Amino acid sequence: MALFKITHENRAVYGGEKFARTVRCEYEYSKAQIAAMLPEMTHKFRCRDAHGITNFWGVCSESNSTAPLDCVGADHGCTEIQYKNPTTGRYETL
């Protein structure tokens, strides 16, 4: 499973709650291990709900992982994850 970090949230969706954090759903890592993995998180993603509203953005260690959606997306109504294509600059649904 990929390591990912939520970098921005849609405050209108969360009512201003702070949500940015590093997440690893199935396993716990030490702060040193997470710090070592942060440079690998270069793949930008966003998670959207069924109405096309982006609930949060982040970076992931893999470009084809559903981990952000699986771990926190459902709790926030997200049904879709998109990764930013580095060539076109556009987000594409996984």
Model-derived features: where do they sit?
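Polar/charged alpha-helical tracts
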Residues: M1, K31-E40, N85-R90
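Transition segment at domain starts
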Residues: M1-E17
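A short beta-strand micro-motif
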Residues: I6, Q33-A36, E40-D49
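Generic detector of solvent-exposed, compositionally biased contiguous segments
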Residues: I6, T22-E26, V59-E62
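Short, surface-exposed binding/anchoring microloops in extracellular/periplasmic proteins
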Residues: Y14-P39
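Generic structural motif
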Residues: K18-R21, F45-C47, I81
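Acidic, low-complexity, intrinsically disordered interaction modules
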Residues: H51-R90
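Short, low-order "capping/linker" segments at domain edges
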Residues: T93-L94
